């Protein structure tokens, strides 16, 4: 029986979340959202858009809450090119699964490093305004896997809020540098869910 790539990814992520839940510390205790800015990638005679909206969460893997699994999804603004002959619209979506480690803590600032996997989906919609019969651009879509490597800072702003800033490089067929800023909300008090 043949299985699609998306089905394999779904099974892998489901198994990872189930395994994380077996550990008594593997609980989601914070969620973040914000903006992502990418150096972009060329696709189908166009580029990808900025900024992106990112949503992510953290699963603590140890009692000290220094090691986390961090899944995230990002949807980027569309890139639109109008030439008078045609309109090209490119969309980019990314899913990441990173392992994050706290390098050190100084007061209310935490330095973190992370690495993991990335899946990028690109979709390009071509709309001809004037048909010549010799169009070299058409509708196109692509799916690529890659790896992330990055670092960042977590800044404590309030008892249940953090501000995070991070940068990473994505190694893939569509390699790019990505900077992200997020507001992070903690579901529980930090005394029980998160140590500083």
Regions found by a protein language model. Name each.
Residues 31-37, 69-73, 97, 111-117, ...:
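Membrane-embedded beta-strand positions of outer-membrane beta-barrel proteins
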Residues 10-20:
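Bacterial N-terminal signal peptides
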Residues 56-129, 157, 187:
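Gram-negative (and chloroplast) outer-membrane scaffold detector with strong preference
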Residues 2-11:
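Bacterial N-terminal signal peptides that target proteins for export
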Residues 22-68, 178-190, 196:
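Short glycine/proline- and aromatic-enriched beta-strand/turn motifs that initiate or cap beta-hairpins
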Residues 27-31, 47-53, 87-95, 109, ...:
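Residues that define the transmembrane beta-barrel architecture of outer-membrane proteins
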Residues 69-70, 76-79, 147, 152-196:
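Predominantly the C-terminal beta-signal and adjacent terminal strand-loop region
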Residues 43-50, 80-87, 124-132, 175-182:
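Outer-membrane beta-barrel translocator domains and adjoining extracellular loop/strand segments
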